Amino acid sequence: MKLKLFLMTSIAVAVFEMAAIAQDTAKPVEPALPDAPQATAAAMIHPNGPTVVMDTSMGRITCQFFEKQAPKTVANFIALAQGTKDWTDPQTSKKMHNKPLYDGTVFHRVIPEFMIQGGDPAGTGAGDPGFTFEDEFDPNLNFDVPGRLAMANSGPGTNGSQFFITEVPTEHLNQHHTIFGQCDDPSINVVKTIARVQRDGNDKPVEAVVLKKVTIIPEGQPVPPAPGATAQTPAAPQP
């Protein structure tokens, strides 16, 4: 299984990197730092649909889906998160039924000023759920703002379970990876913290960053408090 890669900066660089990947998929080249964000129509598309809450060992990440723009991708993520879609354990080749995929997995690849990547049931970057599905690109939805939740892939039509969250605009990824959610500002701060942990030569955290629990919140419903947080009591009315 190929490592999920998504580093393309220009047509010339992409051709060079594709050749390099064919020889060694373990050490992709980091992209150049992106330019300052530009005001585009993409920023006008608002998230719609359910919200995903990812409780990690380093804090909570909350993102609302783009259900209208990426319905198949959102449905796949929700089904894997809730255990309503069968998947194959890449380590045992065993078919998993009624078992959430994401709970207990790790962020296996983190790069400052770029993104954090997770969703691999093998925890290595080479695993997948035993199936793939097609991309869903919206011409007005791009990587022009931080906090994009998107699918990792190894080429067109190779989406599975792996995803990444950006911490900066990364427009060289436009129309190469399906964007299916937008994370809020506090979550982007968590992403930045995770991206700056100590890493090995393959950008894997030395100390595991665990995705403890993934919860799907229906649209319009409140997000429950983070584990360990206490509910805030409303202030007493003034006389």
Regions found by a protein language model. Name each.
Residues 2-8, 17-239:
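Cyclophilin-like peptidyl-prolyl cis-trans isomerases
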